[in-house]
Design a protein with these regions (language model features):
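Hydrophobic alpha-helical bundle signature of multipass membrane enzymes
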Residues: 1-82, 88-123
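A cytosolic-side transmembrane-helix exit/cap motif
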Residues: 52-63, 127-135, 152-160
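C-terminal membrane module of polytopic membrane proteins
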Residues: 141-170
């Protein structure tokens, strides 16, 4: 296997890679994890609904990543490419993990996988550039809204209490 093919595979499986890593990273932050999983499902539903409404075709090439001499066979709603689900998922995961963890190294890794994924979708003619950009914008927007929701729910549970001076009675 050559290095370029491995990069292509990273791009193809980018959403899955980031999803699994995010589950691991958010395991100790259950509330953020729950919101992330729920928002991932919502992200997929939004993607399918928009593809059904917009009905914009994919490029004609649409190469199969596992056999470059063959055109990828698509059925049903998978024939439509607007917005790109891959870019929607990877940017969603990248923005969400950045907002929750605020860790530069993790964010850079996520951004790299996201860029590889978006490039791979265009390289293999699975999507037009516009479809990838719209998917990324949708994913980023949903990540931001999900983070605001999760953060509000967590902060809403913090209630300041008057000190009961329990230690003074001992």
């Amino acid at each position: 296997m050559n290095a370029l093919y491995i990069i292509d595979l990273i791009g193809f499986f980018g959403p899955h890679i980031l999803f699994l890593i995010t589950l691991y990273l958010l395991y100790s932050r259950k509330h953020y994890l729950f919101v992330y999983i729920f928002a991932c499902v919502l992200n997929g539903i939004i993607n399918l609904i928009l593809k059904g409404i917009i009905r914009q075709k994919r490029p004609d090439g649409d190469t199969d990543i596992f056999n470059k001499n063959k055109k990828y066979e698509r059925i049903g709603s998978n024939n439509f490419g607007m917005p790109s689900g891959h870019s929607q998922y990877v940017v969603f995961s990248t923005i969400y993990i950045y907002l929750v963890l605020n860790n530069t190294n993790i964010t850079l890794f996520y951004a790299l996988v996201s860029l590889i994924t978006m490039f791979q979708r265009i390289k293999y003619q699975n999507h037009f550039l516009k479809q990838v950009i719209v998917g990324a914008l949708l994913g980023g927007s949903l990540a931001y809204c999900s983070y605001l929701f999760a953060n509000k729910k967590i902060m809403g549970k913090l209630v300041s209490k008057k000190d009961d001076n329990a230690l003074d009675t001992i």
